[in-house]
Amino acid sequence: MRELRVISVSSAVLALLAIGLTAAPAAADTAATISIDGDGRSVTHLAGSGQVNELQVTPMGAGTGVRRVAFNDEVPIRAGEQHCVQPDPNDATRVVCELPTADASSGEIRILLGDGDDEFFTDAPGVSVVHGGSGNDQLHAHSAHTVIGGQDDDMLMGGVVMHGGDGMDHLMGDDRGQVLTGGRGADHIEAHGGADTVHAGFGDDHVTGGSGDDFLSGGFGDDTVHGDSGNDTLLGGPGKDVLSGGPDTDTILW
């Protein structure tokens, strides 16, 4: 029998899960802000209250000792005081930031989308956190490390760590080994390739492991869990569950 894997969630991620739940409402259509921390290595995008974002974060290559990242949206973005500019003064929806390092693995890019039914796209390296906030969000974040849906019904793609949050969420993994957590609500989780760890959470969930030696836990609710190929471990949890291992040598726990 395979040893169960226990995944801990850092206090930083738990704090991010609460973003948008306690903030006081502001006026609608406030511009988003892009700010860089004191050492110039970390960038935070904070959406304005009432905005519906269609944000794209795009790498623009590196210069001598710097790398450039572009933020493009359908709504206004306000550049911070240092290292970020609006290249076209007539276009308030585009900001370019320069980070004082040519190393894409150095520094962090944090995306906080807030309320609204937002869309997000990136293949830029160095995106550490994407948080959808409230609203039915679509987060295409293949290069990001941690992707959090937040409240409502979200679609998440990519991320080493994904958390759907509250609502009926759809989480889609890739060929890496990932940690996918559904949260509350009837979620649909597709792990795809890699040795994945899936915790479906509360609700009547549908989980598919894909290829790879996966650990799949249905959690609370009437869940359907299918291991697919690979030597998988399936755990049903409380509720009326349907568990199927698929090809290869699987372990099913009730």
Per-region residue spans from a language model:
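Beta-strand repeat scaffolds of extracellular/surface proteins
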Residues: 48-50, 60, 74, 125, ...
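Secretory targeting and sorting signals
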Residues: 1-28
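Acidic/polar low-complexity surface segments
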Residues: 72, 80-101, 148-150, 157, ...
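Glycine-centered beta-turn/loop sites at beta-strand termini
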Residues: 113, 122-123, 131-132, 141, ...
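Surface-exposed or flexible loop/turn and strand-edge residues in extracellular/cell-surface modules
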Residues: 40, 52, 66, 106-108, ...
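Right-handed parallel beta-helix
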Residues: 84-131, 136-139
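Short linear S-[DN]-x-LW-Φ motif typified by the pepsin-like aspartic protease active-site region
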Residues: 9, 28-80
